[in-house]
Amino acid sequence: MSVLLVGVSHRTAPVPVLERVAVTDTDRPKLIDKLLASSHISEAMIVSTCNRVEVYAVVDAFHGALTEVGEILADHSGLDLTALHAHAYVRYSEAAVEHLFAVASGLDSMVIGEQQILGQIRSAYASSDAQQAAGRVVHELAQQALRVGKRVHSETGIDSAGASVVSVALDRAAGIIGEGGLVGRTAVVVGAGSMGGLSVAHLTRAGIARIVVVNRTQERAEHLAETARSNGVDADGVAFDQLSAAMAQADVMVTCTGAVGAVVTLADVHRALAEPDRDNTKHLVICDLGLPRDIDPAVAGLPGVTVLDMETLQRDPAAGAAASDADAARTIVAGELATYLAGQRLAEVTPTVTALRQRAADVVEAELMRLDSRLPGLDDPQRDEVARTVRRVVDKLLHAPTVRVKQLASAPGGDSYAAALRELFELSPGSPAAVATPTDLVDGDRTGRDLQA
């Protein structure tokens, strides 16, 4: 079994395509069920963020599984396979593992070094586990990716600037607002999830004077507002029907709800701008960080309003981590990848070694029974001594080659040694004793492949 990755991200697709492929928390369980119902897929995990969707599947056949994943994503997005192919990337085996480690480290993010991806991978893993879609391979892969990401962030300065999509968007907003930036201004945050919490934290550090949190569940909005108040910021949490009134006072608004369809309509913004207490000299900057987008695209055409969405941020990416920090992170990823793959190769050969020792033990027992029939006069002490001697001989004969084959198996191409043992000693590759769910993460090349390969 090998790992197959099919993904679409900010590096390969424009925002309109990402919107169609986007996987919400509601979508994810349904898609995982479809993946597990496929004939070539035994485990699955879906990583979905504001600028990427990646399906990780444990498969028994590359081409068959690639077709199945492609069809499921095409059906979900409404894109035909040709259109999906134009924006998708495929990684297989070692390359899929390497990619996830790089993603967890923040090396593939739009803002290099951002830490939010770790929480998003953790959420994807938890969702997979909750649906019993995570077997041994996904468990080990996800856990190791999280460990690698944490190590990169703790041992390098890749996130020393504390940059994230939220911070980059708010920095741009401050520049548009002009003198003083966000200091003393009023902000609206739409959505009380993790991105909403991150927005409140950044706004607080930027010196914002007032925050209004808008959420469909007012209790959650109030809880997030209390966090802001505890840090000395005037804040309220309101229900969604208060959105226009809240916008009327705002200099900046941040949205990232994960909802399907426009959460903030053109009519909502018109009402806000028409509120009698709206200061018409204010410029409203809206940071739409949702995928799909939360803001009706027509809002961008209104005078006195600037919309910064993921497409805008992609066109003018922020400076990422220092080159030296990114290089240090890549070095860690490369070392961790080598260690992980060596462990997986060793895990593959171990069941074969166990089967070989069991085969030898069975032969010894059969010969001892044959000895009993040929020399019935042996007393128990004599028979025990013969048995110990035969077993010692067998153990000594097997010790060096089995230790050596484990050493050799941990190197690239090591799976061939397990195959050689099975062939030489007639150990059936389908036997549970010979092969106990091997990971086989090094079966295949490291290059990306087309979706229609």
UniProtKB/Swiss-Prot annotation:
UniProt keyword ATP-binding present: no
GO MF terms, alphabetically ordered: glutamyl-tRNA reductase activity; NADP binding
Family annotation (Pfam families): GlutR_dimer, GlutR_N, Shikimate_DH
Annotated site residues (Important for activity) in this chain: 99
Top-level taxon of the source organism: Bacteria
Positions that bind substrate: 49-52, 109, 114-116, 120
Catalysed reaction equations from the record: (S)-4-amino-5-oxopentanoate + tRNA(Glu) + NADP(+) = L-glutamyl-tRNA(Glu) + NADPH + H(+)
GO biological process: protoporphyrinogen IX biosynthetic process from glutamate
Metabolic or biological pathway, per its Swiss-Prot or TrEMBL entry: Porphyrin-containing compound metabolism; protoporphyrin-IX biosynthesis; 5-aminolevulinate from L-glutamyl-tRNA(Glu): step 1/2
Keywords from the UniProt entry: NADP, Oxidoreductase, Porphyrin biosynthesis
EC main group: oxidoreductase
Active-site residues per Swiss-Prot or TrEMBL entry: 50 (nucleophile)
Keyword Oxidoreductase: yes
Described function: Catalyzes the NADPH-dependent reduction of glutamyl-tRNA(Glu) to glutamate 1-semialdehyde (GSA).
Family as reported in the entry's similarity comment: Belongs to the glutamyl-tRNA reductase family.
Descriptive protein name: Glutamyl-tRNA reductase
Organism: Rhodococcus erythropolis (strain PR4 / NBRC 100887)
